[in-house]
Every structure is written in C-alpha cells, then in structure tokens.
A protein has these predicted regions:
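Acidic-glycine-rich active-site phosphate/pyrophosphate-binding loop
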Residues: 1-9
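Short pre-catalytic strand/loop immediately N-terminal to key active-site residues, enriched for Gly-Thr
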Residues: 9-15, 61-65
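Non-catalytic surface loops within mature trypsin-like serine protease
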Residues: 3, 14-16, 97
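C-terminal accessory "lid"/substrate-recognition subdomains
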Residues: 18-19, 52
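ATP-dependent carboxylate-amine ligase
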Residues: 25-52, 56-205
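Short alpha-helix boundary/capping segments
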Residues: 15-18, 191
Length: 205
C-alpha cells in the first residue's frame, strides 16, 4: 500500500481480495486516529485467519469453510477461491440458504454460484421451519439462468460426503454458509453439526 507517497509492503496470513480491502480499511482508520503506520502494519501481519472465514481445513483437494451466506459474500469467496484453483482443477461450491430469512436472495445466490463455479451442490443451511426442498427450488431458479452444472442433495452431511468422494486432488471445494457455526437448525431444534468434523470423519473412515 502507498501512504503519503511512501510504499509499504504488507504480508497477510489471510486469503482473498476481501481481506485486502478489510486491511486497507483498518489502516485508513489507524491513520485517521494518528497511529503509527509501521506498528499498525506489523500488528496486521501477525493476525491469523478467522475461524470460518476462508478457512482451509484440508488440502488435495482443498476444502475451504466460509460463512458466506449473502450474494455479495458468496461472490467474493468464489472469486477468491478461483484465484487459487489450479488450471486443471475445478471450483466446487456447496451451499444453501437459511430458512425463515430473506427469500429474495435465493435465486440470486443460485445464479452467482452457477456463473462462478464449475460445479455446485445445492443443499440445506438451517432450513428452520421452512421446507428445505422449497428453499432449494428457489435457489434453482437462479441456477437455471446459467450454464452451471449442479446437483441437489438435501441432507448437508450427505452433500459434503458426495463432494469429497467426487473431488479430484486439484479441485477446490467451498463449503459456504455455515462458517464457524457448529449446528444445523431444522424445525425449531438445533442439531450438532460442525462441517470441519464432518469432513475429517468422512476422510478418515
């Protein structure tokens, strides 16, 4: 970054352009508060990744957990993932949309996934009191506006297993929507569900 005609190099431990924008915003705030720029940069360089935010949990294939649950969030994470996807690998997006929440974003997110992923798996993400199949059908409306290839697997655990079983070593799998959450809300009940644990258990069967 350049501050008052002087160039500074910042080495981040975080991935994605959205992390760059966040760091630039933090530095701008630090400058406005009169803080030392070099000390601020050193502090930012020491910050590790945030749990559930572009969190790489395994490699070959890369499996990344991210909280992206809005159109903007999904677009940003898929663009960041595309940057690290090998030329002979596929970008696979597994996602759903929350129940009893804004339903207008569902087709929008379907369209984004269809355009930016090589393959999508549409599944459940805290359906709450809504019918998960109905939520998925609304997502499909947007997906069908694209040429994107996709599969519907309502049960999220089964969807993750399918993604892992069919991925090749150079593929990148994005598990979008839950991030750091350790539960799945079905009806009015919270069920234990940590995607990291689901992935580890499946790979170590």
């Amino acid at each position: 970054c350049i501050v008052k005609d002087r160039e500074y190099k910042v080495n981040l431990k975080m991935n994605g352009m959205f992390s760059v924008y966040n760091v630039l915003a933090a530095l701008t705030t630090a400058l406005a508060l009169g803080m030392d720029i070099e000390k601020s940069i050193k502090t930012l360089e020491e910050i590790g990744g945030v749990a559930g935010r572009f969190e790489v949990i395994v490699n070959k294939p890369a499996v990344i957990v991210d909280y992206a649950h809005t159109p903007d969030g999904l677009e940003n994470v898929l663009k960041a993932a595309r940057d690290i996807t090998p030329s002979d690998g596929r970008l696979i997006c597994l996602f759903g949309c929350g129940g009893d929440r804004d339903n207008t974003k569902r087709p929008i997110m379907g369209e984004i996934a269809g355009k930016l992923s090589d393959y999508s798996i549409i599944t459940s993400d805290n359906p709450r009191t809504e019918d998960p199949v109905s939520i998925i059908e609304q997502i499909e409306v947007g997906m069908k506006r694209t040429d994107g290839k996709y599969k519907v697997i309502v049960d999220r655990r089964e969807a993750i297993a399918y993604a892992l079983d069919h991925a090749k070593k150079d593929d990148v799998i994005i598990l979008a929507g839950k991030g750091q959450e350790t539960y799945q809300i079905i009806g009015k009940e919270k069920h234990d569900f940590d995607e990291r644990v689901v992935v580890y258990k499946h790979l170590n069967k």
